[in-house]
């Protein structure tokens, strides 16, 4: 299953 990233770069 796909798990979206919890942290995104600024």
Curated annotation (Swiss-Prot):
UniProt-reported outcome of changing residue 1 to G/Y: Impairs the inhibition of the mitochondrial permeability transition pore
Annotated effect of mutating residue 8 to G: Impairs the inhibition of the mitochondrial permeability transition pore
Cyclopeptide (Phe-Pro) cross-link site: 1-10
Mod. after translation: Processed by the macrocyclase-peptidase enzyme POPB to yield a cyclic decapeptide. POPB first removes 10 residues from the N-terminus. Conformational trapping of the remaining peptide forces the enzyme to release this intermediate rather than proceed to macrocyclization. The enzyme rebinds the remaining peptide in a different conformation and catalyzes macrocyclization of the N-terminal 10 residues.
Biotech relevance: Antamanide reduces multiorgan injury induced by IL-2, such as lung, hart and kidney edema; but does not have the toxicity of related cyclopeptides such as phalloidin.
Stated family: Belongs to the MSDIN fungal toxin family.
Function as written in the Swiss-Prot or TrEMBL entry: Cyclic decapeptide that belongs to the MSDIN-like toxin family responsible for a large number of food poisoning cases and deaths. Counteracts the lethal action of the Amanita toxins phalloidin and alpha-amanatin if administered before, or simultaneously with, the poisons. Acts probably through competitive antagonism. Its concentration in the fungus is, however, so low that the toxic action of the latter predominates. Shows immunosuppressive activity, probably through the inhibition of the action of interleukin-1 and interleukin-2.
Protein name: Antamanide
Native source species: Amanita phalloides (Death cap)
